[in-house]
Regions:
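Catalytic cores of carbohydrate-active enzymes across secretory and cytosolic contexts
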Residues: 1-205
């Protein structure tokens, strides 16, 4: 997509110790993606430890994979999670052109749509949930489920891997807020599957 004439910005976090200069913008493989810029969000080592290593992996990851009895929910971790999501939203709001489409990825950034919509109502917001979305009975163990569902409902589009996960999300949303279905559209009538090898490189922002 970005190898053509389309321009875009990838907003990503980068660990920053708080000492020395921090480069907020950098290129990403300029020969292959000349129109793609990286906007770096500085996170302290403590932010990374709490937001990603501890909270995302100890609270949300086991819940999403239906191991709710292993989840550890801490209010102080949730507050750090909110602060990091707000940083992502602010950086995105600063970078996005008027009426641009913003594509947000996965549960680590659940609260970005809420913050972003408040700052930039002109944007078209899409969210893809790469991780499995469980049944409402499982998701309801999350203490902040209403805040999370409310944030996701700020999106113009929400994508999931399979129809069952869509149904799970709708059930969770129905339990959190009163709503009604105003329209339905069928998905593709047939699917084509094929196998392929996927190479995974590494990139530090």
């Amino acid at each position: 997509f970005f190898k053509g004439e389309h321009e875009g910005t990838w907003v990503a976090w980068s660990k920053h110790e708080g000492r020395g200069r921090f480069e907020t913008h950098t290129d990403f493989e300029p020969e292959s993606y000349p129109n793609l810029t990286v906007r770096r969000v500085p996170l302290s080592p403590a932010d990374v430890e709490t937001f990603y290593q501890r909270f995302s992996k100890e609270a949300f990851w086991p819940t999403l994979h239906t191991f709710w009895e292993r989840a550890r929910f801490r209010e102080e971790d949730w507050q750090t999670y909110l602060q990091v999501n707000q940083k992502f939203a602010e950086a995105t709001a600063d970078e996005a052109a008027e009426g641009a489409t913003v594509w947000i990825h996965d549960y680590n950034l659940w609260m970005v749509p809420a913050y972003l919509r408040a700052r930039r109502p002109d944007l078209k917001i899409a969210f893809f949930h790469h991780t499995y979305f469980p049944s409402a009975d499982v998701f309801n163990v999350v203490p902040w489920r209403r805040e999370i569902i409310g944030s996701l409902l700020q999106c113009d589009y929400i994508g999931f891997h399979i129809p069952r996960q869509v149904e799970n999300f709708v059930d969770a949303a129905r339990g959190a807020f009163p709503f009604k279905t105003v329209a339905r559209e069928s998905c593709a009538p047939r699917f084509q599957t094929y196998g392929c090898a996927v190479g995974l490189g590494s990139m530090t922002s």
